Amino acid sequence: MRTLWIVAVCLMGVEGHLTQFGDMINKKTGTFGLLSYVYYGCYCGLGGKGKPQDATDRCCFVHDCCYGTVNGCDPKLSTYSYSFQNGDIVCGDDDPCLRAVCECDRVAAICFGENMNTYDKKYMLYSLFDCMEESEKC
């Protein structure tokens, strides 16, 4: 419980994009957004290595790969525009980089929603020391 409180305090100062991504996750999963995924498995959260532990972790692997294709802005810091229309996430930027970041986040949020049945609490706050297998290529 103490660790969850520390993560919550750390996220309180987060502005822009990460709160937007968390909002998308919340809408698609009904969970606490980023808090549910911040240190999940080998790929959710900062960094990422090894083999994705389940379909939920694979969503994060694909998200990391998507961020790797974004050029012209920092995916983790850029603020984009989006809306929810009839339950769908709609990215609304004209700027190609901001639209690409939004699309990466949109696809990941949908993936989390579609794979909620694979979410396993044993992968919450997962140690990267358990992620020593050779990493897959994007």
Curated annotation (Swiss-Prot):
InterPro entries: PLipase_A2, PLipase_A2_Asp_AS, PLipase_A2_dom, PLipase_A2_dom_sf, PLipase_A2_His_AS
Disulfide cross-links: C42-C131, C44-C60, C59-C111, C65-C138, C66-C104, C73-C97, C91-C102
Binding site for Ca(2+): Y43, G45, G47, D64
Main location: secreted
One GO MF term: phospholipid binding
Keywords: Cell adhesion impairing toxin, Disulfide bond, Hydrolase, Lipid degradation, Lipid metabolism, Metal-binding, Secreted, Signal, Toxin
PROSITE patterns: PA2_ASP, PA2_HIS
Residues at the catalytic site: H63, D105
Cofactor descriptive note: Binds 1 Ca(2+) ion.
GO cellular component: extracellular region
Tissues showing expression: Expressed by the venom gland.
Highest taxon of the lineage: Eukaryota
GO biological process: arachidonate secretion; lipid catabolic process; phospholipid metabolic process
Subcellular localization(s) per the UniProt record: Secreted
CDD domains listed in its UniProt record: PLA2c (cd00125)
EC number: 3.1.1.4
SMART domains according to UniProt: PA2c
Motif (May inhibit integrin function (Atypical cell attachment site)): 86-88
Residues making up the signal peptide according to the UniProt record: 1-16
Catalysed transformations (reactions): a 1,2-diacyl-sn-glycero-3-phosphocholine + H2O = a 1-acyl-sn-glycero-3-phosphocholine + a fatty acid + H(+)
Note: Negative results: concentrations up to 2 uM during 4 days does not induce detectable cytotoxicity on human melanoma and fibrosarcoma cell lines.
Purpose of the protein: Snake venom phospholipase A2 (PLA2) that displays an inhibitory effect, independent from its catalytic activity, on tumor cell adhesion and migration. This effect is mediated via specific inhibition of integrins alpha-5/beta-1 (ITGA5/ITGB1), alpha-v/beta-3 (ITGAV/ITGB3) and alpha-v/beta-6 (ITGAV/ITGB6). PLA2 catalyzes the calcium-dependent hydrolysis of the 2-acyl groups in 3-sn-phosphoglycerides.
Similarity comment text for this entry: Belongs to the phospholipase A2 family. Group II subfamily. D49 sub-subfamily.
Matching PANTHER family: BASIC PHOSPHOLIPASE A2 PA-11-LIKE, PHOSPHOLIPASE A2 FAMILY MEMBER
Protein name: Acidic phospholipase A2 MVL-PLA2
Origin species: Macrovipera lebetina transmediterranea
